Amino acid sequence: MKAKSLNTFLLLLTGQFILAASLNLASASELYFIDAHSQLDHRVDDPELVIQRMDESNVYRTILAARSKRQPGEIVDMAEYHPQRIVPAVRTKSGAYNTDNPKYYKKMKKQLRDGRYKAMAEILLYHAQKGDKAPEVMVYPDDPRVKFALNVAIEHHWPFVIHIEFASLQGKQRQQFMQKMKNLLAENPNHAIVLNHLGQLRANELAPLLRQYQNLHVLTAHTNPAIITHSNQPWSNMFDGKKLSSEWKDLILQHPNQFVFALDNVWERHWREFYPEQMAYWKSALADLPSEVAHAVAHGNAERLWQLAPR
């Protein structure tokens, strides 16, 4: 009798292990992504390449903005054709913004009157020159152009995405940008401020900011070897081989609700060549995290911040 009971117990225990393993596999297979910030340059001949790449890598949605000579309305049209996949973002970049021309406000207001945008693209605060494609931009966080965009984001309940390349700043300028970013965070404690590219900060530099400012979130764009190896910019590398490095993994585990997956693809090469390899890195990295953390970073935090329905 005892032997029979023991056998029954072992069978039940084995069944539980099999069930648990099956659930874990199901959880891993169901992990999907939301790219919380990308852009589409006019040199991408076929915009459907975006959807193709998303389908290949289980990216459910992309928050997308126009770039270069591509018009913002083209992104809205694309979103209407793919309403569950593309989230159209107000375009913020322009020569008018860079030169403090009043046309910047006119361009923004025209898009806002359209009423179909669901997000706003990043605001460039410090952007180092990138060859002949992207000029240097230096606009402090307390500039009227930035305050205008912030008020738009607050009014529409959109996260405010900022771009500061701290590793490309030196001395007094770096200190000023850091202090003014802290002021921005402190003055808007109830609004999500999202720093693209981790701000080009190291893990030990970002950690105290995440602890102090609960409204600070960071995008993971351009932080993997697939893109870093093709760039001469000092991007933050979150990886050690195919997995997250220990310092970045620990920081994500400490602040799982403040990290948001993003790619920030822009150019043809980003979409056509680099996309599959970038996604391979991120799938490998998130597979090494607890399921609830992986889901938060991959899509949950973006859904919460941008008020997007889960898949």
Task: Put a short name on every predicted segment.
Residues 4-5, 25, 31-34, 45-68, ...:
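Mid-to-C-terminal alpha-helical segments outside catalytic/metal-binding sites
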